[in-house]
Amino acid sequence: MNLNFMPLLHAYNHVSIDFHFNSSARDFCVHEVPLYEFSNTGEHAVIQVRKSGLSTLEMLQIFSQILGVKIAELGYAGLKDKNALTTQFISLPKKYAPLLEKNTSNFQERNLKILSLNYHHNKIKLGHLKGNRFFMRFKKMTPLNAQKTEQVLEQIAQFGMPNYFGSQRFGKFNDNHKEGLKILQNETKFAHQKLNAFLISSYQSYLFNSLLSKRLEISKIISAFSVKESLEFFKQKNLSVHSNALKALKNQAHPFKILEGDVMRHYPYGKFFDALELEKESERFLNKEAVPTGLLDGKKALYAKNLSLEIEKGFQHNLLSGHAKTLGSRRFFWVFVENITSQYIKEKAQFELEFYLPKGSYASALLKEIKHEKGENNDEF
């Protein structure tokens, strides 16, 4: 497989929208929404921290240096962008809590501010978040492009958007996935096991993005062309599908088509299940109750069936399925953007956008869908 970045398809068909976005603390804000309420009792102090110009790992190092706490004792739910103003929750042993207020000025000098202090009975672990609220400010936006952006946001609010992995997964030089494959091929290896695992997961992410783009291509062909023309496309790709099945797919109201053999999952949390009745599942998808999922290949991954599997096979890798430490999983192909609010400030030529995404989804995917720039499958923020 060619590991260079290929263009990823968009969900919607508008022309490119021109504006400027700068990933900075002024124009990009991320606020973490915790998975559960904190009990205000327990052996772990839980602090809400606001940071700017720092990665989450850099922030943890500062806490370790100032408080004397070991980094391994600090808990966090996820990594937040460096080039943004972000808030997130951090846990640490209760005994360090008295040192927090004493070091307020030391934290502020490092672009950190503690917003709240609570307590809980367990340490915060990776994944212990519900999602994130985002704020983005677009600049150099004309009134016409603001109107176009509003129209795109209406479509996204109704149907959702592709759940692509963002550029954070692929690194500054867009080559993390290549390093991950080299690790699987025993061509290279790093001393830190977590780094090896992350790079392998980047390769999984690359395959997922490529599979999702292929599924979008198929969905667009089904929607745009006649049954006869679509049959010819499937024939050329050596994919088995009958004309009656294509007619049913064409009747699905959602722009992303559910195929025979898809693995569905209740949204936003829930069990996986097979798509047995496509008409029924397409309605549930339209109602944001269940979503088709894509493969993150690994030793214990759940695979699709029938037509969906025929397509998925092109994005599997035997080194992933045979790798003892790479268990594999599935990820929502699609995600629904919630609580979208926006305003256009004409005198400043600025467009302000706020929205919520569940954990694991990227604001850069929304930016990509709005801008519709023809480029590679990484976004420059």
UniProtKB/Swiss-Prot annotation:
GO (cellular component) term, any one: cytosol
EC number assigned by the record: 5.4.99.27
Listed GO biological process terms: tRNA pseudouridine synthesis
Gene3D superfamilies for this protein: TruD, catalytic domain
Pfam families reported in the protein's UniProt record: TruD
Domain TRUD: 160-335
GO molecular function per UniProt: RNA binding; tRNA pseudouridine(13) synthase activity
Key words of the record: Isomerase, tRNA processing
Reactions that this protein is recorded to catalyse: uridine(13) in tRNA = pseudouridine(13) in tRNA
Family as reported in the entry's similarity comment: Belongs to the pseudouridine synthase TruD family.
Reported function: Responsible for synthesis of pseudouridine from uracil-13 in transfer RNAs.
Protein name: tRNA pseudouridine synthase D
Lineage, highest ranks first: Bacteria, Pseudomonadati, Campylobacterota, Epsilonproteobacteria, Campylobacterales
